[in-house]
């Protein structure tokens, strides 16, 4: 009985600790051992990491939480979450992040797991926070990372996404551990994996060939060492993954490698970045002299520019010099190309795989395609430029990309507006396209429909900014637009603005040319060229001046709306009730018949402004 009472007392004491919530928990695990606080430590694509507390051991922990809807959204997300939890539960090493518990909360519909907490965040953020670090400290970090890799590889696990962002630090202990095993692969009865996945800057060349082993982690470790020693992200000089792919497969090292002045550090990193056949294992790298404790204790950071660049390392992905010459030579017209894609609905992004070549010489290029912002033509042009594709035109590649996107996203259609194409349509049909905003005729109704006539250049200049729509030039000052002073007619201000712009076209044609304002030479030749047809341009110039039709219409409509609003404000600013009544039926005999309507309007505004000083407070 006494034993039962003691158990009951312990149970009631434990529930009271959780029930009174003196620790400020937001929620607890089913056993009541772990409590989650509201403080967010980090947030990823699928999960959010909160600060938690382990009441049994009295230590803080990392509470990882993901909603079930996000985990089950795609098979890849589910596989990644399951792989991370299952691997962490089976791994026990002082260089691998520790795993404590996992469970599903039915009512909250969340998946939760508890891991070790690292007070200083990732190694990348820690390194940026403290730029000056000795070689001795970096060597200690490297030994811990290599021990963790050796442990993973001994159990047939490839991390596949090793980088400083996935290495965590306890700054008060100088301790680093490997984490984020969501992309890890387990080799079951084989020695190689085939999926292409990871971060391009840290991916080994053989990963693009879809046949690799544990050596890819050693390559990634070399890039981590380069970042730790130079504080520079690998291949930061590249603008996109295509450039990174080109340099990696060509065996070119990042520019940060040439910042190293320490010969031992350069040699050590070079061992990690050679081709897979000559790359050492993690256990072999642990015996390298670079990682042995230094004799002197006053060594400093190795960030410095090298006086002379070291010789390039052996090519990582080629088998012979003949193969290199074949890649550098222009490809034959019969070179095959296949484009396949995979849709990521969470980020509205399609990951495209371009397979170039055939037989034994095949290149695979992977890159994302943003459905909302990218166009097939832009991506195709970039591919031709960055990958040196000489046997195919960008239009041909763009058609293949669009075909794959339409297959993944039914109903997708990218509209493009081309000035050159519209000129061709004019020659064939005899009349402009309904979306043609730059008519070659000064009296064309289509050309002035949206407020941009044939001689309008670069949108609306002046205080409203410019939009480079064409090479035509004409400036319509706000005062030249006639707007009614009656408040009831404010709804027709847009049509009034359009009419005024149409009336100004002939005046602008006499004082400007298609390429800019009229110069002295232009006037000597007989005036402007607004009525002349547009000259034909090369295919490259046409592609350069191509504009998305949707973006063009949005820009023009926004300019028109902005202009109309400004005119309405000007109308109310200069409108004066007393002056308007005073000037009814009045016309200045000195200016009547000789000045334009705009001059008379300005005179009435000056007269009304004089009366406005006397009746200012009537408004």
Curated annotation (Swiss-Prot):
GO cellular component term, pick one: cytoplasm
SMART domains, A to Z: S_TKc
Catalytic activity of the protein: L-seryl-[protein] + ATP = O-phospho-L-seryl-[protein] + ADP + H(+); L-threonyl-[protein] + ATP = O-phospho-L-threonyl-[protein] + ADP + H(+)
BP term (GO), one: intracellular signal transduction
PROSITE patterns: PROTEIN_KINASE_DOM, PROTEIN_KINASE_ST
E.C. number(s) listed in UniProt: 2.7.11.1
InterPro entries documented for this protein: Kinase-like_dom_sf, Prot_kinase_dom, Ser/Thr_kinase_AS, WNK_Ser-Thr_kinase
One of the Pfam families matching this protein, by short name: Pkinase
Bias (Low complexity): 439-448
Region annotation Disordered: where it falls in the sequence: 1-30, 293-335, 419-464, 508-555, 585-619
Compositionally biased region (Basic residues): 602-619
Superkingdom classification of source: Eukaryota
Family: Belongs to the protein kinase superfamily. Ser/Thr protein kinase family. WNK subfamily.
Protein name per the record: Probable serine/threonine-protein kinase WNK8
Species assigned in the record: Oryza sativa subsp. japonica (Rice)
Gene: WNK8
């Amino acid at each position: 009985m006494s034993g039962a009472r003691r158990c009951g007392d312990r149970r009631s004491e434990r529930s009271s600790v959780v029930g009174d919530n003196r620790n400020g928990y937001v929620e607890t695990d089913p056993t009541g051992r772990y409590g989650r606080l509201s403080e967010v430590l980090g947030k990823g694509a699928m999960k959010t990491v909160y600060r938690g507390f382990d009441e049994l051991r009295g230590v803080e922990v990392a509470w990882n939480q993901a909603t079930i809807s996000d985990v089950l959204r795609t098979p890849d997300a589910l596989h990644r979450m399951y792989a991370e939890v299952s691997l962490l539960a089976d791994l026990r090493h002082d260089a691998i992040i520790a795993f404590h518990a996992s469970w599903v909360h039915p009512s909250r519909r969340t998946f939760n797991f508890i891991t070790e907490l690292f007070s200083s965040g990732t190694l990348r953020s820690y390194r940026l926070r403290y730029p000056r670090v000795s070689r001795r400290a970096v060597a200690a970090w490297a030994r811990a990372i290599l021990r963790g890799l050796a442990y993973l590889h001994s159990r047939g696990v490839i991390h596949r996404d090793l980088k400083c962002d996935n290495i965590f630090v306890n700054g008060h202990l100088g301790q680093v551990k490997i984490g984020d095993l969501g992309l890890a692969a387990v080799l079951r009865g084989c020695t190689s994996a085939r999926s292409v996945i990871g971060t391009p800057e840290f991916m080994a060349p053989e990963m693009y060939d879809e046949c690799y082993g544990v050596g890819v982690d050693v390559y990634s470790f070399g890039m981590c060492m380069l970042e730790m020693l130079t504080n520079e992200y690998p291949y930061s000089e590249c603008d996109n993954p295509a450039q990174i792919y080109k340099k990696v497969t060509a065996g070119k090292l990042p520019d940060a490698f040439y910042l190293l002045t320490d010969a031992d550090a350069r040699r050590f990193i070079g061992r990690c970045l050679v081709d897979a056949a000559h790359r050492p294992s993690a256990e072999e790298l642990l015996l390298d002299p670079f990682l042995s404790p230094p004799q002197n204790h006053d060594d400093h950071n190795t960030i410095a520019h090298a006086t002379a660049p070291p010789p390039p390392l052996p090519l990582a992905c080629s088998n012979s010099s003949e193969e290199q010459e074949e890649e550098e030579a222009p490809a034959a017209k019969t070179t095959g190309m296949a484009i396949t894609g995979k849709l990521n609905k969470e980020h509205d992004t399609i990951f495209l795989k371009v397979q170039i070549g055939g037989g034994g010489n095949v290149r695979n290029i992977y890159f994302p395609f943003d459905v909302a912002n990218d166009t097939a033509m832009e991506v195709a042009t970039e591919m031709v430029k960055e990958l040196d594709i000489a046997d195919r035109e960008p239009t041909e590649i763009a058609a293949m990309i669009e075909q794959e996107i339409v297959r993944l996203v039914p109903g997708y259609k990218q509209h493009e507006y081309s000035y050159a194409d519209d000129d061709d349509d004019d020659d064939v049909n005899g009349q402009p396209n309904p979306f043609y905003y730059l008519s070659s005729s000064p009296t064309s109704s289509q050309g002035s429909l949206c407020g941009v006539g044939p001689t309008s250049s670069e949108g609306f200049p002046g205080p409203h900014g410019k939009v480079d729509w064409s090479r035509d030039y004409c400036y319509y000052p706000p005062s030249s637009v006639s707007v009614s002073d009656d408040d009831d007619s404010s709804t027709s201000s847009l049509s009034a603005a359009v009419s005024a712009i149409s009336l100004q076209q002939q005046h602008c044609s006499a004082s400007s040319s298609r390429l800019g304002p009229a110069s002295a030479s232009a006037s000597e030749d007989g005036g402007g060229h607004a009525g002349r047809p547009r000259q034909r341009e090369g295919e490259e110039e046409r592609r350069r001046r191509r504009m998305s039709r949707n973006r063009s219409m949005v820009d023009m409509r926004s300019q028109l709306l902005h202009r109309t609003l400004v005119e309405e404000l000007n109308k109310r600013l200069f409108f004066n009730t007393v002056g308007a009544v005073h000037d009814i039926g009045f016309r200045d005999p000195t200016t009547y018949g000789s000045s334009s309507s705009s001059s008379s309007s300005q005179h009435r505004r000056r007269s009304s402004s004089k009366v406005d000083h006397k009746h200012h407070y009537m408004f």
